[in-house]
Swiss-Prot record:
Function: Catalyzes the synthesis of alpha-ribazole-5'-phosphate from nicotinate mononucleotide (NAMN) and 5,6-dimethylbenzimidazole (DMB).
CDD domains: DMB-PRT_CobT
InterPro entries membership: Nict_dMeBzImd_PRibTrfase, Nict_dMeBzImd_PRibTrfase_bact, Nict_dMeBzImd_PRibTrfase_N, Nict_dMeBzImd_PRibTrfase_sf
GO molecular-function term, one example from the UniProt record: nicotinate-nucleotide-dimethylbenzimidazole phosphoribosyltransferase activity
Gene: cobT
Protein name per Swiss-Prot or TrEMBL: Nicotinate-nucleotide--dimethylbenzimidazole phosphoribosyltransferase
Pfam families documented for this protein: DBI_PRT
Organism (species): Pseudomonas fluorescens (strain Pf0-1)
Length: 351
């Protein structure tokens, strides 16, 4: 394992499994293509799992949490203390993702990379204590390189635990007051896009608040403009600990051969960073939904991603990806359990 492990090769998709799964789809008792994207996603999962009939019995959800120094600029509708409070809610079973994980029978892990709440120690939470949140990126780099690499490794470690537990699908979620500001800034820097196109209300800012948020991002982009061509340094300049952990998790999944279901805007920006760092990881990423945050559509289009759902979500936590899991499971069930024309003694072409 090299020091810059995130640049290591990604696993190859099993092309034989893809071909055989596609051939099976042609033999199932239905008109070819009549199940639409349920067919293509089952074939895609076959290639990622290396088996003609993929299954999604074991789903792992990691929630990465971290606070953001840029909140000092007044860019969020909620106080920073909410990040630490939500950690308790996650492990107590009261958060949306907690309910979804229970209903899906998924393993839920909560990782605190660094919040402003001092000496936070909660049973059931992994506290990595990288720092008391990031620094204010409108005035300097959000994190040091050492902190950034620790956050990347934190994401990778979650994936290694998931793989050891037999996970067939990895979902990363996030919690961090101020993190839509960080994600918007990152996306603007990487895509060289107008700030107003990628900046939205987050957890509930009004129009005046969104305008102020955009102005803060403009200042930060000007401050860090010289390093905009370096995706990793841009992540460290403008990102959050939890965003860096997501980047590390997505890259580790591609290297370890675990399929990823990407959640909303913040997670999709993390996916964009991951693809910029190691383009081969893109094959391992599926996208759960298109959310309400205005920048989400643009980042999805840049990645050539077709999300499974569009429900106007803007919660985060991995919730949109979790909601798409039943759809993926049913796609696998249809693919694996439907009869072929030969098995059912049904004519496979019109009279």
């Amino acid at each position: 394992m090299t020091q810059a492990w995130w640049l290591n090769p990604c696993k190859s998709v099993d092309t034989d499994a893809v071909e055989n799964a596609a051939a099976r789809q042609q033999q199932l008792t239905k008109p070819a293509g009549s199940l639409g994207r349920l067919e293509s996603v089952a074939v895609q999962l076959a290639g990622l799992q290396g088996q003609v009939k993929p299954t999604l019995d074991h789903v792992w959800i990691s929630i990465f949490a971290g606070d953001h120094g840029v909140v000092a600029e007044g860019v969020s509708a909620f106080p920073q203390e909410v990040t630490g409070q939500m950690l308790l809610n996650f492990v107590s079973g009261g958060a949306a993702i907690s309910v979804l994980a229970r209903q899906l029978g998924a393993q839920l892990e909560v990782v605190d990379l660094g919040t402003v709440t001092p000496s936070l120690s909660l049973p059931g939470v992994r506290h990595l204590n990288i720092g008391p949140g990031t620094a204010n990126f409108a005035k300097g780099a959000a994190m040091t390189r050492a902190q950034g690499e620790l956050a990347l490794q934190g994401g990778r470690d979650s994936v290694l635990r998931a793989k050891a537990a037999g996970a067939q699908l990895f979902i990363g979620g996030e919690m961090g007051i101020g993190n839509t500001t960080a994600a918007s800034a990152l996306a603007c820097a990487l895509l060289d896009c107008p700030v107003v196109h990628l900046t939205g209300p987050g957890t509930g800012l009004n129009a005046e608040g969104v305008s102020h948020k955009a102005q803060v991002i403009e200042r930060a982009l000007a401050l860090h403009a010289a390093q905009r061509g370096d995706a990793l340094q841009t992540l460290f300049n403008l990102g959050g600990f939890e965003i860096a952990a997501l980047v590390g998790a997505y890259l580790a999944c591609a290297q370890e051969g675990v399929a990823v279901l990407v959640d909303g805007f913040i997670c999709t920006v993390a996916a964009l960073v991951a693809v910029r760092l190691n383009p081969a990881c893109r094959e391992w990423l599926l996208f759960g939904h298109r959310g309400a945050e205005p920048g989400h559509r643009h980042v999805l289009e840049t990645l050539g991603a077709e999300p499974l759902l569009e429900l106007g979500l803007r919660l985060g936590e991995g919730s949109g990806a979790a909601l798409a899991v039943p759809l993926l499971r049913l796609a696998c069930d249809l693919h694996g359990q439907m009869a072929t024309f030969a098995e059912a003694a049904v004519a496979d072409r019109p009279a």
